[in-house]
Design a protein with these regions (language model features):
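Conserved P-loop
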Residues: 80-138
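N-terminal accessory segments
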Residues: 1-75
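ATPase catalytic-site recognition across NTP-hydrolyzing enzymes
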Residues: 265-342
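Conserved RecA-like ASCE ATPase "motif II neighborhood" in helicase/translocase motors
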Residues: 150-209
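An active-site-proximal beta-strand-loop segment
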Residues: 340-353
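Conserved nucleotide-state-sensing and coupling region of NTP-binding domains
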Residues: 112-173
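ASCE P-loop NTPase helicase motor core
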Residues: 194-266
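Nucleic-acid-processing active sites and adjacent nucleic-acid-binding tracks
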Residues: 356-397
Length: 400
């Protein structure tokens, strides 16, 4: 057996350099975050041991730890919700798939997503990692290497027999089984998720195809993505008010929500309204979206950024009940009422305060009046607006 010195000489390295590489390789083999670091060398370098393009944050460490528990068999069903552009696919697909295959070269894995083009992109990126010096360092065994004749973007096979298949959600229904299935963003965009027909099709595909492709009842499933609709797959799995909800199925899952702005009981221990990745998207960026005048942007923020979808139609008000009117159409004889909504709790700072002024005509139609006020303001400004409305509308009684 060659000595460490002989191997170092053969590779053109010093003994210290070789030992450093072996240490990094061993660490990357055991730790997903270490593997992500090692397999993301700086531009122009094939391998960077002490430098990397990958800079993991707290939420990446949490996700990596959960995925490691999937690999160890501690978690059989894992669901993670993250805002857009916060590194979910980079870690959970492009890094996790080669890492898991390297550790399990005889097992098979399926990655499914909303479309074949994205699936192929994932496959190409994973292939690049498989062929990188970092992967060779972490998983040097012959069984862990790609077969030369099986390097298509949609199907990568290792010499040890394991296969990674990448497919759009429509292509999941037929073919070989898998020891792990990873579903990444099953809806392409909000337009898809707003379609009841598409939601039903994705749900049927999830139930019929994902479960049927697993090689055993012990085979894990990872569902990761950005929320798009309150009735998406996650909504049907975990919302007790959803008609499809099954408590027996829901309790099998380990579920983690990572909203852009922290809420009470944050899994990372963040303060309320602390940003998930402040170096990339600040709290001010998300607060501006939360308080935007556009209904669409506010709904996108709540649904995608906060991983907490809201219905375009609420439980109390339906779109068809609402209509606009011209000033000349406003009746002269109305019963005037004013209601207020105050952002007074600590976790509501930066929210707008609202003074809603309505008039009710003799037919009980409610008219929202133009002096309705909705702004971010201090309490003294709010009281001034109350006094203004009371005076302008000659309101006889007011309660605060």
């Amino acid at each position: 057996m060659p000595t460490v010195l002989a191997i170092a000489v053969a590779l053109g390295l010093s003994t210290a350099q070789l030992q450093e590489r072996l240490l990094y390789g061993s660490l990357a083999r055991q730790s997903l975050i270490a593997f992500a670091w090692l397999s993301s060398p700086p531009p122009g370098q094939a391998l960077g041991l002490d430098k990397s393009r990958y800079t993991p944050k707290r939420h990446h460490g949490l996700v990596a730890g959960l995925l490691e528990q999937v690999d160890s068999g501690e978690i059989r069903r894992l669901e993670i919700e993250q805002p857009p552009r916060t590194g979910k696919s980079e870690l959970a697909v492009r890094k996790f798939v080669p890492w898991w295959m390297g550790r399990n070269p005889g097992k098979s894995l399926i990655v499914t997503t909303h479309s074949d083009p994205l699936a192929n992109e994932h496959g190409r990126d994973c292939r690049d990692v498989f062929e990188s010096p970092a992967y060779q360092l972490a998983f040097p065994g012959r069984a862990c290497q790609l077969r030369e004749e099986s390097k298509a973007m949609d199907r990568l096979q290792l010499r040890g027999g394991g296969v990674a298949i990448f497919t759009g959600r429509r292509g999941l229904g037929a073919g070989a089984g898998a020891d792990l299935i990873l579903a990444d963003d099953l809806f392409k965009n909000s337009d898809e998720a707003e379609s009841p027909a598409v939601r039903d099709a994705v749900w049927r595909g999830y139930n019929a195809d994902v479960e049927s492709r697993l090689n055993s009842e012990e085979s894990p499933v990872v569902l990761i993505g950005t929320r798009r609709n309150e009735d998406d797959v996650q909504g049907r799995l975990f919302d007790p008010t959803n008609a499809h909800y099954d408590p027996n199925q829901a309790r099998r899952w380990t579920r983690v929500r990572l909203p852009a702005l922290a809420e009470t009981g944050d899994p990372l221990g963040r303060l309320v309204d602390e940003a998930l990745w402040p170096e990339k998207f600040s709290a001010e960026f998300y607060l501006a979206r939360r308080n935007h005048r556009s209904d669409i942007i506010r709904i996108e923020h709540q649904t995608q950024d906060q991983c907490n979808p809201v219905a375009l139609e609420g439980n109390y008000f339906k779109r068809r009940w609402l209509a606009t009117y011209e000033a000349a159409e406003l009746p002269k004889h109305l019963r005037i009422y004013c209601a207020s909504d105050h952002a007074y709790r600590k976790d509501q700072r930066n929210d707008r305060q609202c003074l809603l002024v309505v008039g009710i005509d003799p037919s009980d139609t409610i008219w929202v009046l133009p002096d309705t006020w909705w702004e971010r303001a201090t309490t003294d400004v709010l009281v001034e607006q109350m006094i203004r409305i009371i005076g302008a509308r000659q309101i006889g009684r007011a309660h605060v």
